[in-house]
Curated annotation (Swiss-Prot):
This is N-acetylmuramoyl-L-alanine amidase L2. Keywords: Antibiotic, Antimicrobial, Hydrolase, Secreted. Its main location: secreted. Has bacteriolytic activity. The keyword Secreted applies. GO terms for molecular function: N-acetylmuramoyl-L-alanine amidase activity. It catalyses: Hydrolyzes the link between N-acetylmuramoyl residues and L-amino acid residues in certain cell-wall glycopeptides. Optimum pH is 8.0. Optimum temperature is 65 degrees Celsius. It is found in: Secreted. One of its GO terms (biological process) is defense response to bacterium. One of its GO terms (cellular component) is extracellular region.
Length: 13
């Protein structure tokens, strides 16, 4: 799956 980590300028997959 794709887990969205909002720990950057944009969502990282």
């Amino acid at each position: 799956x794709n887990v969205v980590f909002l720990n950057x300028p944009x969502p990282q997959w």
